[in-house]
């Protein structure tokens, strides 16, 4: 079992505030439904945040990084050293998510949840049980104790962020090989073949995708994790940064903080989180559908519809960051528009 808190129930949606938001939307100076999904987004946030005025102003971004032993099987187009180099790039402000965080006014924290780095890095929070996972094609990626540590690292990151009273949280990831790990987790959770899930990741070609799928399918058989418990799956084929995000999602939901879900890898972490603690599901707000072919299946399993689809496949939390202005617009429109009565506008056609 994982730490006891992982299974604690999350708060329920405030029906009072959700229903009040529905009433307000019907009173705003626009035809019913004219703002499309932005209306429902504002209503959902009002219920999740238990407020009459949903907010998306304070949105910290937390990036979890980890390395993957499965890279030894030639599943990635880039060398493992890129993980550490990109962590330094995050910290120095040169990565895509660094630029987006500045543009959005979001605090960016980077957590080394399990990279191969042997040194403390300036601007990086180190919170890891080991240096990278084991190669899951030959042995289990993690022990239960290591998995539990990663969940606790995610909870600690959320506790730090919660001190600033955030309206939402965005989680991102970095780790060469983590699309393979995520595909293995998703295929195991969904009980489907890796061929249906595995995508190009950092840019492998068709032959590379086929090889990745074969490696994953063989590992699922080796460990006997097809449709197994999420705990068993995460130990067998998981990743430290992915496990940390699982823990962070549950910890955020338990604090009534909605999470704007990023792309394929974070969505897989979200699916595992929901399987572990179904009460966190309402707090997941999908941002985008990525170019990774398995993302659509994972979103369907989560029963959510993304806000945008721009063929992104960068990760880092970038898709969620790009979608955040839409969430802010939904809140601003809900809170700031005049009602028919305030504007002295007839509320129905003549």
From Swiss-Prot:
TM ranges are none
Source superkingdom:
Bacteria
* Organism encoding this protein: Bradyrhizobium diazoefficiens (strain JCM 10833 / BCRC 13528 / IAM 13628 / NBRC 14792 / USDA 110)
Which protein, by its recorded name, is this? Nicotinate-nucleotide--dimethylbenzimidazole phosphoribosyltransferase
User: What EC number(s) has UniProt assigned to this enzyme?
Assistant: 2.4.2.21
Catalysed reaction, written as an equation? 5,6-dimethylbenzimidazole + nicotinate beta-D-ribonucleotide = alpha-ribazole 5'-phosphate + nicotinate + H(+)
Q: Does the keyword RNA-binding apply?
A: no
One Pfam entry for this protein is DBI_PRT
